[in-house]
């Protein structure tokens, strides 16, 4: 169920609870609580706390010849994964600057992870470690009234920890090239989760018919696993640090007639070479041109509903 209530004039809150019955694991509960307090007409403080659950999948129960049953256990030995999340944020709108700003602090924890590694004897089982992520998100929208230009921007910092490969008992049970200590926070970070990420987008209305936008993003250095092609120790499975990169994209649209719209896009304008996963290169510079038909828009849909309601 989901219950929404307003205990005070400026305080809004919700409370949700869910109960799931699994044929093997049994009944598990999850839920979420949210609060929002209006400071004035333009600002508010918000927060939420939630607890989630993920039941074992068929893959976890039938992992080749490495199922828990094949190793002398029972299916009932596999428990659900559990997660907790908390965030605290502040939103405001600055009238004199036509600027919307938002800041959010967050933290998440995942435990009882289902995985197969040395400390589980290479059988799908629940590990004892706790994966964590915490950080801050900053975002803003600058949209001047009666102007042709607007700007969106955001920044995310994530300090994460990968318990699956970096907990002491895992490192003591098996020697490999994962989670080596070199004095960097990335050594124990979650795989493919950058510590720093920035994104921005400039929108410009050249005319009522022609619109364009230039977007860019920066992704900081990221940890990833090695593979058999890497070479060196541990059969090549040595952690890799993917380089940071910048990517810029251009999108333009032109309204032709009767709902038809022409689009012209340039992806990765600077032809940046980068990897989001180790030894998997991303696309270089691309050009796309197309024509599409728009049968309805959000504004038109609202007007149609208003006309229908007024006629009734």
How does the language model describe each region?
Residues 1-22, 26-32, 36, 146, ...:
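Surface-exposed extracellular loop regions of Gram-negative outer-membrane beta-barrel proteins
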Residues 3-5, 19, 27, 37-38, ...:
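Residue-level signature of outer-membrane beta-barrel architecture
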Residues 6-10, 98-109, 127-228, 261, ...:
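Gram-negative outer-membrane beta-barrel transporters
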Residues 15-19, 47-51, 60, 90, ...:
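Transmembrane beta-barrel strands of outer-membrane/channel proteins
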Residues 19-31, 49-53, 80-86, 105-111, ...:
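Transmembrane beta-barrel architecture of outer-membrane proteins
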Residues 38, 42-44, 51-110, 117-144, ...:
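Outer-membrane beta-barrel signature, preferentially recognizing the C-terminal barrel domain
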Residues 47, 142, 186-312:
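Conserved C-terminal beta-signal and adjacent last beta-strands/turns
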Residues 59-75, 115-124, 162-187, 223-240, ...:
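Solvent-exposed loop segments that connect transmembrane elements
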